[in-house]
Amino acid sequence: MSIWEYANPVKFMRTSGAILPWVVAGAAACTVTGLVWGFLTPEDYKQGATVKIIFLHVPAALMAINIWLMMLVTSLIWLIRRHHVSALAAKAAAPVGAVMTLIALITGAIWGQPMWGTWWEWDPRLTSFLILFLFYLGYMALWEAVENPDSAADLTGVLCLVGSVFALLSRYAVNFWNQGLHQGASLSMAPGERMAAVYRYPLYLTMAGFFLLFLALLLIRTRTEIRRRRLAALLARENRA
């Protein structure tokens, strides 16, 4: 069985419909359990209760970057192989990615204010995340502005290529520049820098929950986009008749 079989809308609708309830259940279980567990953890000796924002901020930030990279992959599949489901999946993922980026920006400001004494700083990672959020908005606006769906998919695919620079910059900005207020990677594996287990395990669970939540929303929104495309085709056929 080839993976490209799932680019067929009929095959995708059947398979996604079968797994969607399980994905939703897993997303709810992991997210709720991880967040409750996380917010019951003890306060950090340096950051106090504000450290608990990590259970929202880190999963949202990781998903914001990875969703854009997923959109890049599906857009490349569209540009190379012209599979419509991949283009619709990229379109469906964009609003979810925009919300994740916004959550990361807001929670980052709330988390950083007590530590930095300011709600915003033109730190490399913060700035690249803001630019990534603007790319998400531009991507969605471009889909709405171009009437022909195939042309819209082509143009947004090119935009994905450009925006991927900022997605990667958001991920590795702390490594590129030593200056800046933002701390290093929260899940660093370097000796002496690993997060305490009391925070690490609920964070892993919340990250899994956010991934499953994205997957559930992606399947739901892609299925909706396929139905819209089918309805538009039927209406166009009736108008020609």
UniProtKB/Swiss-Prot annotation:
Disulfide bonds: none annotated. It is found in: Cell inner membrane. GO terms for biological process: cytochrome complex assembly. The keyword Magnesium does not apply. One of its GO terms (molecular function) is heme transmembrane transporter activity. It holds the Pfam family Cytochrom_C_asm. Keywords: Cell inner membrane, Cell membrane, Cytochrome c-type biogenesis, Membrane, Transmembrane, Transmembrane helix, Transport. Coiled coil: none annotated. It comes from the Bacteria. GO terms for cellular component: plasma membrane. The chain crosses the membrane at residues 19-39, 53-73, 92-112, 126-146, 157-177, 200-220. It is a multi-pass membrane protein. Belongs to the CcmC/CycZ/HelC family. Required for the export of heme to the periplasm for the biogenesis of c-type cytochromes. PANTHER family: CYTOCHROME B_B6 PROTEIN-RELATED, HEME EXPORTER PROTEIN C. This is Heme exporter protein C. It comes from Paracoccus denitrificans (strain Pd 1222). The lineage of its organism: Bacteria, Pseudomonadati, Pseudomonadota, Alphaproteobacteria, Rhodobacterales. The gene is ccmC.
